C-alpha cells in the first residue's frame, strides 16, 4: 500500500516557482489606451465643475471645524452665565 504524499514536497515547490514566474509576467506594465479615464479627468483641464485648489479646501475644512468648536464653547459658556 502506498502512503499518500505528504504536504509540501517537490510538487509544491514546482507550483510556487510557476506561480512566481507567472506573477512577474503578469505584473509587467501595460499601456493604457483608454483616453477617457475618469480618475485622470479629475486633474485635467477637461474636467467640468468648480476648480478649487486643494490648499483652499484644507483651509475651509479647518475653518469649519474651528467654527463648530467655537460655537460649542460659546453655548456652554452662555448656558452657565444665563
Swiss-Prot record:
Keywords for this protein: Endoplasmic reticulum, Membrane, Protein transport, Translocation, Transmembrane, Transmembrane helix, Transport
Ranges where the record places region Disordered: 1-36
UniProt-listed InterPro entries: Sec61-beta/Sbh (IPR030671), SecG/Sec61-beta/Sbh (IPR016482)
Entry GO CC: cytosol; endoplasmic reticulum; endoplasmic reticulum membrane; membrane; rough endoplasmic reticulum membrane; Sec61 translocon complex; translocon complex
Ranges in the topological domain labelled Cytoplasmic: 1-53
Compartments it resides in: Endoplasmic reticulum membrane
Main location: endoplasmic reticulum
Composition-biased stretches (Polar residues): 19-36
Membrane topology value: Single-pass membrane protein
GO molecular function, one term: protein transmembrane transporter activity
Residues annotated as transmembrane: 54-74
GO aspect biological process, one term: post-translational protein targeting to membrane, translocation
Keyword Endoplasmic reticulum recorded: yes
Job of this protein: Part of the Sec61 complex, which is the major component of a channel-forming translocon complex that mediates protein translocation across the endoplasmic reticulum (ER). The functional states of the translocon complex include co- and post-translational ER import, cotranslational membrane protein integration and retrograde transport of misfolded proteins out of the ER. In the cotranslational pathway, ribosomes synthesizing presecretory proteins are targeted to the translocon by the cytosolic signal recognition particle (SRP) and its ER-localized receptor.
Subunit comment: Component of the heterotrimeric Sec61 complex, which is composed of SSH1, SBH1 and SSS1. Presumably three to four Sec61 heterotrimers assemble into an oligomeric ring with a central aqueous pore. In cotranslational ER import, the pore diameter varies from 9-15 A in a ribosome-free resting state to 40-60 A in a functional state when associated with the ribosome. The Sec61 complex is part of a channel-forming translocon complex whose composition seem to change dependent upon different functional states.
Family stated for the protein in its record: Belongs to the SEC61-beta family.
The protein's name: Protein transport protein SBH1
Amino acid at each position: 500500500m502506498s502512503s499518500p504524499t505528504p504536504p509540501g514536497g517537490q510538487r509544491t515547490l514546482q507550483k510556487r516557482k510557476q506561480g512566481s514566474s507567472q506573477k512577474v509576467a503578469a505584473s509587467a506594465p501595460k499601456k493604457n489606451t483608454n483616453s477617457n479615464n475618469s480618475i485622470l479627468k479629475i486633474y485635467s483641464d477637461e474636467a467640468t465643475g468648480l476648480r478649487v485648489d486643494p490648499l483652499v479646501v484644507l483651509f475651509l475644512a479647518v475653518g469649519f471645524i474651528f467654527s463648530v468648536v467655537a460655537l460649542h464653547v460659546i453655548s456652554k459658556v452662555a448656558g452657565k452665565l444665563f
